[in-house]
């Protein structure tokens, strides 16, 4: 853990004790958009416990985003796009948010649809298979990070040191982060995700923003939104089923192809290979990024 005697001003935003509801029309707004920001205490990566919670949060985000993206495969959905995220608000608070672009003639239906997909998770929880995939992807990410450590983009290093200075986040590096992940991930359960997901439902500490093109005349009111929300809570929803087909993209074993021509370009240290099937391959080993540095202030 990084320790410091630095003192910083407290920036905790008091609890709203209500839903702050905003409806805005703008001639430059091209599509109808709803955003629901739920205020939470900021998760600071000062302790191992918080690192575990950050994994849990990120797994929730990733799984829900995949679910929302899957629902968009149905062309009859009233949504154009849907998303879930978290963002910094102050040094002490952050937003847990979700939102969607709504089809122009189906705004209320689109809000109902979005809220129902989130309610589906509240009622049925996450799937063990979903959690397993997230854990595997996380381990793969760190394994790749270790392999590419020498060519890591400098802006990510600068961002990490910045968080260490401003938020007291510890700095560890990919190898140590990999060890921590291997230690923590087996302890994370579906119940952890189900409980953490409730942070996206702060009914008395949130901002609901609806942005509409100026041409939209049927502007939804706060009362109408609350009524939709109450109706959705009464739905009896089944467990999520992805609209993506769970099958291999390539089912057949692909045959190889012989190299029929090779050529070397010494001036640029590149080899050209032409294959029997017509494919050209250019191979250029490089260490160009190993000593590069980028900085932005």
Regions found by a protein language model. Give the residues of each.
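Proteolytic maturation boundary segments
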Residues: 1-50, 54-55, 61, 65-69, ...
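Short amphipathic C-terminal alpha-helix that caps PH/PH-like domains
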Residues: 1, 60, 64, 111-119
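Acidic/polar loop patches that form or flank catalytic/metal-binding clefts of enzymes
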Residues: 2-6, 67-81, 123-130
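M16/insulysin-pitrilysin zinc metalloprotease superfamily fold
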Residues: 71, 87-148, 169, 183, ...
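A structural supersecondary motif
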Residues: 37, 61-102, 160-163
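Hydrophobic, mid-to-C-terminal alpha-helical segments
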Residues: 150-162
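Juxtamembrane/interface motifs at transmembrane-helix termini
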Residues: 149-153, 214-217
